[in-house]
Amino acid sequence: AVGGVLALLGGAFLHDWPQAALWHVVFAAGAMPMIFAAMTYFTPVLTRTPDAPRALVAIPLAALLAALGIVAWFAHGIAAFRHIAPGLGVAAALVFLHWIGRRWRACLGRPHACLRWYATALACLVLGLTAVGLSAVLPANAGPLRAFHLHVNTLGFIGLTAIGTLQVLLPTVLGQPDPAASRRLARDLPLSVAGTLAIAIGAAWWWPLTVPGAIAYAWPLGRLLADTTRAFGSRPWRPRQASPLLVAAIGGLTLVLTHGLLHAAGSANARNA
């Protein structure tokens, strides 16, 4: 939210800033630390373990510093940040993955299936940041690597986190269990991951790969919407509660997926990624 406000202010008052800098304020400085913070809260719930230690707040802060570093590169051309920022982001993600792994092992019984979505989303972030780091030392491949970075982060890191969290939050908000959620999360993760990687690789190097990728990614979204309607009926759409926004997030992900497919085919613009 803060990132979005800063981006709007930047667009209004900092006309010399490139669009890439402003969008990285929104997604890197805004969304990335927020997702780390959300995972920090939900991981103990999903593993039935104690609250996260206070020291773990350093991870979202490190992610924010990495994001501000890449914004500084785009806005002011500070070359050192182009190399340092992706590495700092990768380090933050790997440390966080290690913490999730420790909580996983400490869990009595099996952790909630959503935890696998979080771990996979973080792995996608590592891939995306590694790609953008490589683009600095492999300038001939910078375009494809940036395209891979864009799609593996939006559909992988942000998308997988959103899909997993949505299936935990919606029953909580409605006060009604969804007995199919755990089975659906376990069954749909391979399809969503395959779709993410196919779209990212296709957008970077061979666009026809994005078509089966989009189908693989969209199938779990359609199944989630159908199961939600079957389990809860019209209740999620009732006003004065958070559930309409949660269900609408499925539509938002579908729009992102559609734009990703068009971008990979060369019909949509993402020059400022």
Language model region names:
Residues A1-A273:
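Hydrophobic alpha-helical transmembrane segments of multi-pass integral membrane proteins
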